[in-house]
Regions:
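Conserved, well-ordered alpha-helix/loop/beta-strand core segments that scaffold catalytic motifs
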Residues: 228-260
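Generic structural signal for well-ordered alpha-helices
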Residues: 50-54, 143, 239-243, 321
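Short, flexible active-site-adjacent loop segments at beta-strand->alpha-helix junctions, enriched
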Residues: 70, 181, 257
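Alpha-amylase-like alpha-glycosidases and glucanotransferases acting on alpha-linked glucans and related
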Residues: 4-39, 75-236, 260-389
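A short N-terminal beta->alpha junction/helix N-cap motif
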Residues: 40-44
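Catalytic domains of carbohydrate-active enzymes, especially glycoside hydrolases
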Residues: 17-18, 45-73, 323, 327-331
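Conserved, mostly hydrophobic/aromatic
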Residues: 57, 66, 175, 246, ...
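Hydrophobic faces of well-ordered beta-strands that scaffold small-molecule active sites
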Residues: 23-27, 62-65, 253-255, 332
Length: 389
């Protein structure tokens, strides 16, 4: 303990000499440590080991920067293609669910079995495929016990959570139900054409038909939809618990906002994206052809209305960042910042090369299509032309 205090004192002195007020520890939540014998295959900031790490960095760092917290897919572990609103259920600490604080929703037997069967329990690496399935099964057990025991405090919390987060939760949960209905979670290949566009009707007839379909699916998969909300509630409760503990140690959590949108988000908000255009990276020293990321791009014309008020896309982005700042008092890191300020866009099916029509979304005044989005800068002004010319 004495040595640890000495190290912290020396580091503080060094930061003062360097004139640094902020010093952040960076770690993706899935990489957080686990206690001996309690390794499920995926880290959690909310775990006891997570608290120990917070204790360790306290006094040296004043913030912890986490990776993107969105829900990932079974076939894609990258947090940079996760959901923008829903939290990843993999970050829920199962150990906490066995405690009275969480009404012993999960049996210790199930928890211990998951830890014991973890194929990477003795390795410093996650077991993504394993825990993706095991975590969902464990949370299903917790949900069944929730319905069986009906703890009033948690029932009340769930209803409040659903009401306060209806703007995004209803769509995300509905997508889960539609994925079951259509046999896969990738909406572009769903056989039911209406299901592909339920949140984006183009006329009154579609609006009425889609509303009826939503009601049908919501009734048919009511339990699955409630289960989805239940998992999001648990993630939220544990996140709040972690935030409060970290703040008590003078540590603030920093979020990470990726430039991508998940399949679930594209489905829900597809009318807000620029049709036929994708986000990528221009040719550079690392790639002669550039990088075709395939991420959708927010339509600039949907960001603001003609009167200057926020458009539908603007409201979406405001809601997203508001949620992130509330959950993360340390702020938000934006991955690939230029992708938000002035993204490099290319035509779907083409390369991200200029000769194939690619360009900067907000600074291509001579581009046949993109010029209407160009924002004039000081360098664009002809200073030789005066008002009297």
């Amino acid at each position: 303990i004495v040595m640890e205090q000495q190290h912290k004192r020396i580091i503080k002195e060094a930061l003062n000499v360097l004139g640094k007020k902020n010093f952040a520890f960076i770690a993706h939540a899935g990489s957080f440590p686990a206690e001996e014998g309690k390794n499920t295959g995926f880290g959690s900031v909310a775990s006891n080991a997570g608290k120990t790490l917070v204790d360790f960095v306290s006094g040296i760092f004043n913030a912890i920067q986490l990776g993107p917290a969105g829900k990932t897919k079974s076939c894609d572990s990258s947090p940079y293609t996760g959901t923008i609103f829903s939290n990843n259920p993999l970050f829920i600490d199962l150990g906490l669910l066995t405690t009275p604080e969480f009404f012993s929703l999960l049996s210790e037997e199930t928890y211990n079995k998951i830890c014991e069967n973890n194929p990477n329990k003795d390795k410093n690496k996650t077991a993504y495929s394993y825990i993706y399935k095991a975590q969902d099964e464990a949370l299903r057990e917790a949900y069944d016990n929730f319905k069986k025991n009906n703890p009033f405090k948690l029932v009340e919390a769930l209803e409040t959570f659903k009401k306060n987060n209806a703007m995004w939760l209803e769509n995300d949960a509905l997508y889960e139900a539609l994925s079951i209905e259509n046999g896969n979670d990738y909406w572009p290949i769903w056989e039911n054409e209406d299901d592909k566009h339920l949140c984006n009707p183009k006329n009154q007839e579609e609006k009425e038909r889609f509303a009826a379909r939503k009601a049908e699916i919501s009734e048919k998969y009511a339990d699955e939809i409630e289960f989805y909300a239940f998992k999001q509630l648990l993630a939220s409760l544990q996140n709040e618990r972690t935030k409060e503990y970290a703040l008590s140690k003078d540590i603030r959590m920093i979020a990470d906002r990726q430039v991508a949108f998940s399949d679930r988000d594209v489905w829900a908000y597809q009318a807000l994206f620029l049709d036929g255009w994708m986000l990528g990276c221009p040719p550079d020293l690392f790639s002669d052809d550039g990088q075709a990321w395939g991420f959708p791009v927010i339509n600039p014309e949907k960001m603001y209305n003609e009167d200057g008020s926020l458009g539908e896309a603007g409201k979406l982005m405001k809601a997203l960042f508001k949620k992130m700042f509330v959950e993360n008092p340390g702020g938000v890191r934006i991955d690939h910042l230029v992708g938000l300020i002035d993204p490099w866009v290319y035509k779907a099916g083409k390369t991200p090369k200029i000769e194939d029509g690619a360009g900067r979304l907000y600074s291509s005044p001579e581009h046949e299509f993109l010029k209407k989005f160009a924002v004039a800068t000081e360098e664009d002004l002809n200073e030789e032309v005066t008002a009297d010319t």
